[in-house]
């Protein structure tokens, strides 16, 4: 049973070692913290962090992110780092004080839609109360100063994701075009499509806490939970 899901960007701006004590986009960090806190009110047995990486696979649930992956000048831990998206998800759980079971699930950047959906279905069939923390960015081509420069298609792509999430229609994320997402540098695509496989139904209650494109990259923070009508009595 899925108790809830959070969508969060996987931006280095969430890591204090990158931005220092003063958050560069404080409202983004605040939205992520609030979303994760809401996720944990569902009392999941396990939180599954899903994020894009070089290849699909599970990572050590006790692993940590080495900040030096973002910039060589940052202090290195000396240990093998988690992929950035998973490491940032783990950091959000740590900051929320979560000490329960966690699973860190990477999904390859180039995984086809069908494989992402199958993985999501497997994650939803554990027989336990699970919550999903889904890490990934929207398009990185929203403005002239964006990492990938301006692509006129970027805003419409991010708006399509936002519409599906606001409507609680996570199954619609299956229809995101993989090639277009690649062209737009939308790294969240495979993780979102894992979510669509895990939780394909409509009518979920959704709350979008942040949706903007600072520095030309689309960031979406949202919390979703089963609607009251679809939640079984415990």
Feature map (PLM): residue ranges:
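A short aromatic-anchored loop/beta-hairpin motif
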Residues: 1-81, 86
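Structural motif
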Residues: 3-6, 46-48, 103-104, 130-133, ...
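Short, hydrophobic/amphipathic alpha-helical packing segments
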Residues: 28-37, 89, 116-120, 192
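Cap/lid and interdomain-hinge subdomains that line or gate substrate/regulatory clefts
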Residues: 76-121
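Active-site beta-strand/loop microenvironment that shapes enzyme catalytic pockets
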Residues: 110-159
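Polyanion-binding loop/helix "lid" in catalytic or ligand-binding cores
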Residues: 165-211
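Long, Lys/Arg- and hydrophobic-enriched amphipathic alpha-helices
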Residues: 199-234
